[in-house]
Amino acid sequence: INWLKLGKKVSAIL
């Protein structure tokens, strides 16, 4: 799992 990518996705949603 790419946490950096996941974090960016979550940030975009928030």
From Swiss-Prot:
Claim: Cell membrane is one of the keywords in the record: no
Listed GO CC annotations: extracellular region; membrane; other organism cell membrane
Keyword hit for Manganese: no
An example Gene Ontology molecular-function term: toxin activity
Transmembrane domains' residue ranges: none
Tissue expression per record: Expressed by the venom gland.
Keywords of this entry: Amidation, G-protein coupled receptor impairing toxin, Mast cell degranulation, Membrane, Secreted, Target cell membrane, Target membrane, Toxin
Modified residues (Leucine amide): 14
Superkingdom of this protein's organism: Eukaryota
Primary site of residence: secreted
Subcellular compartments: Secreted; Target cell membrane
Family, as annotated: Belongs to the MCD family. Mastoparan subfamily.
Role of this protein: Mast cell degranulating peptide. Has hemolytic activity. Its mast cell degranulation activity may be related to the activation of G-protein coupled receptors in mast cells as well as interaction with other proteins located in cell endosomal membranes in the mast cells.
Protein name (Swiss-Prot/TrEMBL): Protopolybia-mastoparan-I
Organism: Protopolybia exigua (Neotropical social wasp)
